[in-house]
Amino acid sequence: MKINLERLCRRLNYHFNNIAYLKQALTHCSAGSDNYERFEFLGDSILSFVIANELFNRFPLHSEGQLSRLRSFLVKGEMLAEIAREIDLGDYLFLGQGELRSGGFRRTSILADALEAILAAIYLDGGMIAAKQIILMLYSSRLDDPDLNHCLKDAKTQLQEFLQASKFALPEYVLTKIEGDEHAQIFHVTCTIEGVSQVAYGTGPNRRKAEQLAAKAMLEQLQG
C-alpha cells in the first residue's frame, strides 16, 4: 500500500509530511472509525473558498449571482468525482467489504467526498498555500476552459441554442397539471420538439422552474 500512496502523492504533486493525514482522508466510514467524514467537512469549505476567491479575481465584471453559479458548477459532486477519476482516486480508497463488493470505489458520492477529504488533509499537513496550489492545479483545465461561462445560461437558453445549432424546431412547453394547496402548488410541464421523438418532463413550485427542469431533462436526452 505504501507504493500506492506514493503514486497518489505523485499524481497530486504533493509530498505529505504526515502520511497519516492522507490515510485517514482515504478511509471510508465503512472501513473504520478513523475515517474521512470530518476531513470531508473541512475540505468542502476550503475548496469553496479557494474556488470563490479564484473566480472573484478572474471575473471582475461578473455579478454575485454569476459567481455563485460558477462556483456551484465547479464544486458540485459530479465535478469532484470527475477530477477524482482523473487521478484514479478510487484505486487508493480504504473501503469496508460491503462497499468494496458493491463497487464503492466507483461511486460518485464516495469519490467526491474522498477528494474533499484529501484537500483537507493537504491543508492540515501543509497549510492553506499548499491546499490552494493543489486545488488550482486540479482545476486548471476547467478554470481555463473558454466555455466555462456556458453554465451561466439557464437550461431553456442552452436547449434553444442547441436546437438552433442542430437545425431543429424550437421546444414547446405545455403546463399539464397543477396540484396541491394554493400555498404549496406543484406545477407539471411537458417539453416536446417537433420532429423529435423524445419527451421531457419537469415539476416545480412554479411554472418557470418546471419549464427549466423540463428543458434540462430534454437537453440531457438529446446530448446523450
UniProtKB/Swiss-Prot annotation:
<dbReference type="InterPro" id="IPR036389">
    <property type="entry name" value="RNase_III_sf"/>
</dbReference>
<comment type="function">
    <text>Digests double-stranded RNA. Involved in the processing of primary rRNA transcript to yield the immediate precursors to the large and small rRNAs (23S and 16S). Processes some mRNAs, and tRNAs when they are encoded in the rRNA operon. Processes pre-crRNA and tracrRNA of type II CRISPR loci if present in the organism.</text>
</comment>
<dbReference type="GO" id="GO:0010468">
    <property type="term" value="P:regulation of gene expression"/>
</dbReference>
<dbReference type="GO" id="GO:0008033">
    <property type="term" value="P:tRNA processing"/>
</dbReference>
<keyword id="KW-0540">Nuclease</keyword>
<dbReference type="GO" id="GO:0004525">
    <property type="term" value="F:ribonuclease III activity"/>
</dbReference>
<dbReference type="GO" id="GO:0003725">
    <property type="term" value="F:double-stranded RNA binding"/>
</dbReference>
<keyword id="KW-0255">Endonuclease</keyword>
<feature type="binding site">
    <location>
        <position position="116"/>
    </location>
    <ligand>
        <name>Mg(2+)</name>
    </ligand>
</feature>
<feature type="active site">
    <location>
        <position position="116"/>
    </location>
</feature>
<protein>
    <recommendedName>
        <fullName>Ribonuclease 3</fullName>
        <ecNumber>3.1.26.3</ecNumber>
    </recommendedName>
</protein>
<feature type="domain" description="DRBM">
    <location>
        <begin position="154"/>
        <end position="224"/>
    </location>
</feature>
<keyword id="KW-0507">mRNA processing</keyword>
<dbReference type="GO" id="GO:0006397">
    <property type="term" value="P:mRNA processing"/>
</dbReference>
<keyword id="KW-0694">RNA-binding</keyword>
<dbReference type="Pfam" id="PF00035">
    <property type="entry name" value="dsrm"/>
</dbReference>
<dbReference type="GO" id="GO:0005737">
    <property type="term" value="C:cytoplasm"/>
</dbReference>
<feature type="active site">
    <location>
        <position position="44"/>
    </location>
</feature>
<comment type="subunit">
    <text>Homodimer.</text>
</comment>
<dbReference type="GO" id="GO:0019843">
    <property type="term" value="F:rRNA binding"/>
</dbReference>
<dbReference type="InterPro" id="IPR000999">
    <property type="entry name" value="RNase_III_dom"/>
</dbReference>
<feature type="domain" description="RNase III">
    <location>
        <begin position="5"/>
        <end position="127"/>
    </location>
</feature>
<keyword id="KW-0819">tRNA processing</keyword>
<dbReference type="GO" id="GO:0006364">
    <property type="term" value="P:rRNA processing"/>
</dbReference>
<dbReference type="InterPro" id="IPR014720">
    <property type="entry name" value="dsRBD_dom"/>
</dbReference>
<feature type="binding site">
    <location>
        <position position="40"/>
    </location>
    <ligand>
        <name>Mg(2+)</name>
    </ligand>
</feature>
<dbReference type="InterPro" id="IPR011907">
    <property type="entry name" value="RNase_III"/>
</dbReference>
<dbReference type="GO" id="GO:0046872">
    <property type="term" value="F:metal ion binding"/>
</dbReference>
<keyword id="KW-0963">Cytoplasm</keyword>
<dbReference type="Pfam" id="PF14622">
    <property type="entry name" value="Ribonucleas_3_3"/>
</dbReference>
<keyword id="KW-0479">Metal-binding</keyword>
<comment type="similarity">
    <text>Belongs to the ribonuclease III family.</text>
</comment>
<keyword id="KW-0378">Hydrolase</keyword>
<keyword id="KW-0699">rRNA-binding</keyword>
<feature type="binding site">
    <location>
        <position position="113"/>
    </location>
    <ligand>
        <name>Mg(2+)</name>
    </ligand>
</feature>
<keyword id="KW-0460">Magnesium</keyword>
<keyword id="KW-0698">rRNA processing</keyword>
